[in-house]
Amino acid sequence: MARLTKRRQADTKAIQHLWAAIEIIRNQKQIANIDRITKYMSRVHGMHPKETTRQLSLAVKDGLIVETLTVGCKGSKAGIEQEGYWLPGDEIDWETENHDWYCFECHLPGEVLICDLCFRVYHSKCLSDEFRLRDSSSPWQCPVCRSIKKKNTNKQEMGTYLRFIVSRMKERAIDLNKKGKDNKHPMYRRLVHSAVDVPTIQEKVNEGKYRSYEEFKADAQLLLHNTVIFYGADSEQADIARMLYKDTCHELDELQLCKNCFYLSNARPDNWFCYPCIPNHELVWAKMKGFGFWPAKVMQKEDNQVDVRFFGHHHQRAWIPSENIQDITVNIHRLHVKRSMGWKKACDELELHQRFLREGRFWKSKNEDRGEEEAESSISSTSNEQLKVTQEPRAKKGRRNQSVEPKKEEPEPETEAVSSSQEIPTMPQPIEKVSVSTQTKKLSASSPRMLHRSTQTTNDGVCQSMCHDKYTKIFNDFKDRMKSDHKRETERVVREALEKLRSEMEEEKRQAVNKAVANMQGEMDRKCKQVKEKCKEEFVEEIKKLATQHKQLISQTKKKQWCYNCEEEAMYHCCWNTSYCSIKCQQEHWHAEHKRTCRRKR
């Protein structure tokens, strides 16, 4: 049955200050009475004696401080009974407490509502309308228990995702471990009901003890709860714990948004941003203020804003107004973009992503990849062996054919070096006719044979000279064309290299400027903080100095005598409480009233 009860009332930070005061006083072999405790709290922590007394009485009611009657054994109070205060010892069984003492939401004491399933307690005002108590006769479950009860998730899959989150929690919890290592403090368990830290959370993740993401989130919130209770809401440790919890909630939100993106962004395989998700993200052209349109994936939409993640090197996230979003099918020439090297790389990544979409290529787990690789390797090895077997006989047969007919093929002419666009000149037809006619007359007589040989030699020389001139001209033209093409290619390469260098220099310049601005801002903040602290110290010193001067003036004023008639500094004494600054004032006061009340002996 649900019920409201006051578990504790004292402030946790005040309790720790009181513990320190009692411990210091006891170490000095003195009784920790109310006077010594109030003096210590006023001197060290600036707490008013009335507030100290109130917090001390509440701590006694909460059982966090033990009150006894002690008899003094030395000094002015020897033999006199006086109230003394002690730290609680091990006689109290703290392990039997089933519920926390402080609200899980605001971390403060007071009247709380107790959960029937777990150790958590809440103030009624800290609960939303959905979780507030409706009927006191029925059992009540806290928001954490209700959220854990709703979810059912694959443990193996959840463990993979939670390991990424825990690894980031460990990185961010380094400062928390440096700043706060008091969980071994003897009084730690008097304030913290259920202790937890990042190594404990990691161990539970590795052992698969979490049943849902909400249960993991509850442990992260418990870490924040314990830190605020033990170190205080305004402590540096509490700020680190808040940041750790906020980052953990952000990681869980990203996981719920898209599990594929969350896994790939943490595992970071090659081309991880190009793999399609299930379901696929909408592809758009997004335009940030001060930049042109850039290819991006839509992560979520909220009101008139669109959360996108850009293609490119850094894969940055941004909220873009919906009017600055264009569909990916829009013609790129209508967008008027500046085609820098970074933009081209982003478009290349977009094309690869679209190709993966067309091919239905999704990211697979390591076990599936190993199976496919083994199958492919076995198939490739078998095909390579078959290829070797089929190729070896062909090579031997070719060698036998070459040994039988070594000179069957004629050498190719030099015209093979000319490109296919050139026209190769042919031999003149009349020369071929002369050579044929002379060859047919060889059988008739020897004198015509000699004439034919001389004619053929002359014609062959003329043909060779004509071919040489034409081929020389063709090769010269081809050489000039190659030079011009080479020049144009060189200019293009140089131009692209200059553009790349310019874009890289602009990027480095922008990063340097941003870094310098951030450093200057940090330095300015540090200087402002120093100036504020210095002004505050000077102000306090000035107040102390003025108070001292005022006290001295009051003391000097009290030591003087003053005229009863005009209140100026007196010079003439009349009687026990009457003095005057001049004879005139004495006479005026004497005739007015003093002659009837003067006690001076005459």
Swiss-Prot record:
A zinc finger (PHD-type) spans 100-148. Zn(2+) 1 binds at C563, C566, C581, C585. Induction: Down-regulated in breast cancer patients with poor prognosis. This is Zinc finger MYND domain-containing protein 11. Changing Q586A: Highly decreases interaction with Epstein-Barr virus EBNA2 protein. No effect on the inhibition of EBNA2-mediated transcriptional activation. The PWWP domain specifically recognizes and binds histone H3.3 trimethylated at 'Lys-36' (H3.3K36me3) and adopts a five-bladed beta-barrel fold with an extended C-terminal alpha-helix, with a conserved H3.3K36me3-binding aromatic cage formed by Phe-291 and Trp-294 of the beta1-beta2 loop and Phe-310 of the beta3-beta4 loop. Specific recognition of H3.3 histone is mediated by the encapsulation of the H3.3-specific 'Ser 31' residue in a composite pocket formed by the tandem bromo-PWWP domains. It comes from the Eukaryota. It holds the Pfam family ZMYND11_CC. Residues 366-459 are annotated as: Disordered. Residues 149-255 form the Bromo domain. The modification Phosphoserine is found at S421. The keyword Chaperone does not apply. It is linked to A chromosomal aberration involving ZMYND11 is a cause of acute poorly differentiated myeloid leukemia. Translocation (10;17)(p15;q21) with MBTD1. Intellectual developmental disorder, autosomal dominant 30, with speech delay and behavioral abnormalities: A disorder characterized by significantly below average general intellectual functioning associated with impairments in adaptive behavior and manifested during the developmental period. MRD30 patients manifest intellectual disability, speech delay, and subtle facial dysmorphisms, including hypertelorism, ptosis, and a wide mouth. Behavioral abnormalities, including attention deficit-hyperactivity disorder, autistic features, and aggression are commonly observed. It is found in: Nucleus; Chromosome. GO terms for molecular function: double-stranded DNA binding; histone H3K36me3 reader activity; methylated histone binding; transcription corepressor activity; zinc ion binding. A zinc finger (MYND-type) spans 563-598. Zn(2+) binds at C258, C261, C277, H281. Residues 435-459 have a biased composition (Polar residues).
